[in-house]
Amino acid sequence: TADGIPIVLHDVTLELTTNVESIFEGRQRDDGLFYAIDFTLAEIKRLTAHERTDLSGKAVFPDRYSGDGVHFEIPTLAEEIELVDALNAKTGKCAGLYIELKRPEFHESEGADLYASVLQVLREYDRLGDNPETVIQCFDPVTLKRVQSDGIFKGPRVQLILTETILGM
């Protein structure tokens, strides 16, 4: 977010999975997209999350649960950790966290250190140790090398690779 709070969202933009266009009309960038980093957490909490749509607003997965009439918020990473911890306590299970650092190079170009923000939350919830239930994954190899070399996060790390990279497409 604009105020440096890590949120749980698949994309760095909001228009395909929220009602951002109807709430914050005119806040898109020149490319027509609404970037999460341009909104404070308070603003993002005003949005309703929904199933993915295409740019025309048509459901990408029309047979999935629509959530019509329900206000689903975009959670912060801290809220998600609290949810997982509460479920684990209630069920006696050990569900973990699989965190993707989404486009850290983009965030860096915007003056934000995504990795540092995520580390701060993980530190608050004692998730930095050698714990296989907390995983960090990323497409950016430079960021994953930083995760390894700084030695702060000791859990598993996963290098993501695009199909185009593997197949040379």
Show which residues each predicted segment covers:
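Short, ordered coil/turn segments that flank beta-strands lining enzyme active or ligand-binding pockets
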Residues: 2
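Metal-dependent phosphodiesterase/phospholipase catalytic core, i.e.
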Residues: 5, 10-166
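Glycoside hydrolase catalytic-domain groove-lining segments
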Residues: 169
